[in-house]
């Protein structure tokens, strides 16, 4: 005999849906208000001549693709994209990935002593605020004799150096690698935990060396997490602003003027909000293309 449902009471399925909506609703609303809406508004601004001051600030006009045509024909913007690609490749894809993988492998090594101290030292740059890290490194690499780097050189009888002026891009790449190793280590360490020890031991019994085991056994099994990290670190590194701005402000000249610095200067220093928004949209499209490329290489369905 089927019991009659009491009038006015919801079924368990509807109660579950109601609870799910109640729990997810605030988060979805916050994302819509503070992420999706500003992003859509930024895309709209990219097609206008909006400025911070002047008549265009009061009554912006729709200009279609004019901002994009100007940017794609601008040597300064294209050069900033090239510098951004160089910065992302050497600091994120090469530096952070390789050193992060090395740190994760060392934490799994049985012969390593003091793993807790080693892990803490690697994680330390991650918890230091970007502004604090930037100003600290600016003091360390100062061209003055009081700079920590020059004091160390003086101890060995060498003359003073000015890394931020003589090799600005190399300096910011090294500092960004220092800050990003921690995330790579955490993600790769978690991925390595899923690699069966039996496969590694079997490969060693067959005579495979450490590099052969890593290349033919470990790396194929963590292919997905590696490409996921490459995607995440590419996105975050393209958006690096504070580190470079507080260290060099895009200089000397335009040597470290990345796309993020270029967008900031156009939007806020030159008051060209529409132009800065258009540059952001171009950067977003390039990141989407890179993301699809990473997913294709990793053989991950999107």
Model-identified regions with their sequence ranges:
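Short, Lys/Arg-rich, polar N-terminal cytosolic tail immediately upstream
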Residues: 1-14
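A structural signal for multi-pass alpha-helical bundles of membrane permease subunits
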Residues: 13-302
